[in-house]
Amino acid sequence: MILNEWGEGSYIEPHKEFGFGYLDAIREVFTSAPKAHVDLTPADVGLPVPQVEMTFTSKPQWEFVRDTYGWDNGMNLDNPRIESGALTAVTTGNDPAFFGPPVQIAASRYRRLRLRMRLESAEQQFDDMGQVFWSTRSLAESESTSVRFPVHVDGKWHDYTLNLGENPRWRGVVTRLRLDPCARARVKVQIARIELLP
């Protein structure tokens, strides 16, 4: 039965505050049904929506030998491409970022991220900060869903391992990763590999 109480229409249904009281009143006024009855409700009323864990068909690992695997989208980067077996770009601003492809990764299975990266500046050698962000089905990408790590801008290859699991917001199903390789302009970035580890 559909009611048109306010003009937009509504269903007769239990009320959050008053439960089945409104329905009981309608039954008593308009029917000859006995007062004794059972109110039926789904067993999962009031429970949180379950997070269904979808699994990666293979290990979440990207080797940038011939393909960008969707990591060629970003900001403050000039011409992300594969060059010399690495995802390569030059930063054009102080907040460069590689946006990863859409994924469905159970955070509980992978608590660390490891990447092999080389940063080079024509001006000088220096240390800087990188950052990895993530979004989940219930959390948007933000400072609170990120981990910072020190990087070396010295033209040499370095392996960086980040403990994402230390952040309490690394949970649920991760839907995208974002890598900020540094926080400077005019830095050549080369990434050979990004992988998630248990």
Positions of predicted regions on the chain:
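Extracellular carbohydrate-recognition regions
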Residues: 39-77
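Short, exposed beta-strand/loop patches in secreted or surface proteins that constitute
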Residues: 73-83, 88-90, 151
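Short beta-strand-to-coil "C-cap" segments at the C-terminal boundary of structured domains/repeats
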Residues: 28-33, 192-198
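Extracellular ligand-binding interfaces
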Residues: 87-168, 173, 182-190, 195-196
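Acidic, low-complexity intrinsically disordered segments
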Residues: 65-75, 82, 184-195
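Substrate-binding cleft of secreted/luminal carbohydrate-active enzymes
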Residues: 1-45
